[in-house]
């Protein structure tokens, strides 16, 4: 705090007001991002969209991807096992190959042009399992997929905060992706997430009413 900014010979009330203004200014400075101020959480989750057209004018950086995955790591997981894994393709040649050979379903190859691609996996037989390999309950490896979903939600919300957009794709050729990126057999390939700067503004889809999904007892 820069107390030197406080003018001398002011009343106590005026001095307190100046200190408050300095504190608020420092706080606002601390929450600035490259795109402006941080969004409030409710605004953040409502602004997130699945984007199917990306601008070729903006390249996603390695540093931005690191921020996304760091946010993903803050998600809770079964006994803190953190079994999610991320394989990011930034190279234009590699991303074109991945899109053409592994994302040709539902025109995902076209929808993700000019976007970085993140393959998301989880190490199976850990989350939801005891050390001897016995499942803790009937869900089994569903817990690994569940935990990865929690991580990926953090990732796409962080992308929104940074002014980036995403598209989660489940239609992909997992075998070809595994071979192309040398993903171990001990990991289950779940989704591919496109990350980039939106070149469209999708409307917000209608959501279910609370009474359709929520019950109190």
Model-assigned labels for residue ranges:
Residues 72-73, 118, 136-180:
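Small-aliphatic-rich amphipathic alpha-helix that forms the alpha element of a beta-alpha
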Residues 7-8, 14-20:
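Cationic, amphipathic, low-complexity segments that mediate targeting or membrane/lipid association
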Residues 64, 77-148:
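Glycine/small-residue-rich phosphate/adenosyl-binding loop
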């Amino acid at each position: 705090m820069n107390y030197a900014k406080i003018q001398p010979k002011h009343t106590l009330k005026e001095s307190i007001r100046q200190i408050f203004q300095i504190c608020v200014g420092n706080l606002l400075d601390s929450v600035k991002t490259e795109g402006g101020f941080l969004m409030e959480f409710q605004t953040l989750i409502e602004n997130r969209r699945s984007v199917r057209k990306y601008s070729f004018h903006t390249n996603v950086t390695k540093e931005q991807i690191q921020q996304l995955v760091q946010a993903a790591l803050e998600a809770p997981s079964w006994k803190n096992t953190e079994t999610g894994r991320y394989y990011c393709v930034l190279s234009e040649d590699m991303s074109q190959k991945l899109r053409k050979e592994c994302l040709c379903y539902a025109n995902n190859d076209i929808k993700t042009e000019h976007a970085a691609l993140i393959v998301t996996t989880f190490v199976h037989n850990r989350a939801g399992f005891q050390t001897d390999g016995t499942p803790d309950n009937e869900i089994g490896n569903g817990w690994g997929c569940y935990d990865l979903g929690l991580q990926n939600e953090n990732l796409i919300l962080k992308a929104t905060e940074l002014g980036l957009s995403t598209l989660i794709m489940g239609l992909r050729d997992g075998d070809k992706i595994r071979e192309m990126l040398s993903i171990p057999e001990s990991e289950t390939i779940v989704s591919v997430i496109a990350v980039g700067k939106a070149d469209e503004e999708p409307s917000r889809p209608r959501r279910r009413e609370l009474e359709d999904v929520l019950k109190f007892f």
